[in-house]
């Protein structure tokens, strides 16, 4: 007899993971700039390694930001507050190498190709995409957050790992950590159980592996994962190397944009390749990916598909997307062509249209930079709202 069950795995990391430190620093700098200059152009990259951080990129703004101060405050909030943790916000070196946005790029963003020879004063018409590229958004009805279960639980576990460290429940934990969840699906593609959970957490030198394993199960896994998803066959791998004392930037260098699958759908949907953190919303790598999630989530919430993936693509300096594609993986209640037409009618997917539709000039980005940009339960981002459901239903009648 054929076994039609399948396994799917996703991972998340804590805010103290080196790559996530870099993402948070880049977005903290972006927020500090947008707070005073909502029209700033920011492309901020961060590298962290033992004892130092390097901030590089292109920033055009009318405001002043004390970048070293922002970096230190961010590292402090994450929890690297003592030299014995291998990284210390007070004593670390901070190097900056910031230039202005290229005028060649700026001219295409300031005035879109379609309107370059016209007298359009409307910002939505005038703004071109900041780069070429393709972006994906996805939603599924398998969880209440419209996210795949594996990435949803991975984020919840990673956040819980941080919470029990910060509130003192497990005061021997250190900021770096990773989580991985394997979900078993039945023959109808419904999640039925957790097959495997992997947790690797940085810890103090004087705690035993047995205590860590016992505490992580009691204080992280069991309070987070629904009881009905764990059974006697579920496997737990907690610090499987046996020791994780050296961590954070001392253990591995970190870079902005190296956790793009963690940031999105845990590998369950396609990815266009561009990262989010450190980029202002004229960069379609970020804003169009948020818009694509917004579209996909509203389509699924409207009951027009059980799962939906939206692809958007842009040309640098051009306002209108060069393509819109929708895939419902055979779960659509109407044709994908009808959905594309409904999306064109009810969503303005030009860069400035997205910025206006989702109010993206706010300093909201630092909080996106750990535990996922989508399907969050602790904060409602504008691209998660479900205000297009009725319009979409009416459009496909």
UniProtKB/Swiss-Prot annotation:
It comes from the Bacteria. One of its GO terms (cellular component) is cytoplasm. L-methionine binds at residues 58, 101, 252, 283. Residues 101-111 are annotated as: Flexible loop. Gene3D superfamilies: 3.30.300.10. Mg(2+) binds at residue 19. K(+) binds at residue 45. GO terms for molecular function: ATP binding; magnesium ion binding; methionine adenosyltransferase activity. The keyword Nucleotidyltransferase does not apply. Pathway: Amino-acid biosynthesis; S-adenosyl-L-methionine biosynthesis; S-adenosyl-L-methionine from L-methionine: step 1/1. It holds the Pfam family S-AdoMet_synt_C. Its cofactor is Mg(2+); K(+). It is found in: Cytoplasm. Keywords: ATP-binding, Cytoplasm, Magnesium, Metal-binding, Nucleotide-binding, One-carbon metabolism, Potassium, Transferase. Homotetramer; dimer of dimers. Belongs to the AdoMet synthase family. Catalyzes the formation of S-adenosylmethionine (AdoMet) from methionine and ATP. The overall synthetic reaction is composed of two sequential steps, AdoMet formation and the subsequent tripolyphosphate hydrolysis which occurs prior to release of AdoMet from the enzyme. This is S-adenosylmethionine synthase. It comes from Staphylococcus aureus (strain MRSA252). The gene is metK.
């Amino acid at each position: 007899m054929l076994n039609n069950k399948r396994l799917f795995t996703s991972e998340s990391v804590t805010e103290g993971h080196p790559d996530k430190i870099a993402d948070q620093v880049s977005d903290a700098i972006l927020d500090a700039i947008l707070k005073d200059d909502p029209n700033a152009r920011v492309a901020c990259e961060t590298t962290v390694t033992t004892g130092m951080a390097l901030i590089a990129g292109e920033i055009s703004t009318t405001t002043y930001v004390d970048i070293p101060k922002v970096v230190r405050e961010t590292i402090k909030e994450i929890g690297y507050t003592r030299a014995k943790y291998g990284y210390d916000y007070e004593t670390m070196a901070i190097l900056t190498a910031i230039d202005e946005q290229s005028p060649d790029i700026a001219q295409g963003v300031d005035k879109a190709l379609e309107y370059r020879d016209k007298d359009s004063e409307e910002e939505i018409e005038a703004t071109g995409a900041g780069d070429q590229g393709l972006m994906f958004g996805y939603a599924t009805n398998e969880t209440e957050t419209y996210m795949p279960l594996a990435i949803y639980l991975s984020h919840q576990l990673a956040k819980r790992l941080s919470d029990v460290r910060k509130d003192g429940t497990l005061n021997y934990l250190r900021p770096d950590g990773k989580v991985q969840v394997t979900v078993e699906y039945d023959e109808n593609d419904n999640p039925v159980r957790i097959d495997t959970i992997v947790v690797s957490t940085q810890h103090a030198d004087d705690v035993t592996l047995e205590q860590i394993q016992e505490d992580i199960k009691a204080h992280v896994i069991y309070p987070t994962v629904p009881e009905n998803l764990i059974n006697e066959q579920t496997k737990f791998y907690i610090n499987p190397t046996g020791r994780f004392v050296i961590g954070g930037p001392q253990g591995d260098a970190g870079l902005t944009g190296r956790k793009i699958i963690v940031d999105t759908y845990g590998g369950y949907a396609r990815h266009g390749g561009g990262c989010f953190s450190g980029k202002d919303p004229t960069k379609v790598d970020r804003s169009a990916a948020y818009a694509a999630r917004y579209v996909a989530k509203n389509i699924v919430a409207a009951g027009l598909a059980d799962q939906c993936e939206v692809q958007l693509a842009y040309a640098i300096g051009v306002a209108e997307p060069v393509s819109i594609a929708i895939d419902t993986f055979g779960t659509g209640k109407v044709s994908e062509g009808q959905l594309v037409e409904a999306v064109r009618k009810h969503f303005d997917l030009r860069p400035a249209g997205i910025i206006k539709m989702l109010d993206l000039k706010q300093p909201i980005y630092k909080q996106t930079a750990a535990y996922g940009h989508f399907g969050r339960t602790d904060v409602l981002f504008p691209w998660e709202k479900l205000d297009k459901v009725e319009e979409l239903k009416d459009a496909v009648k």
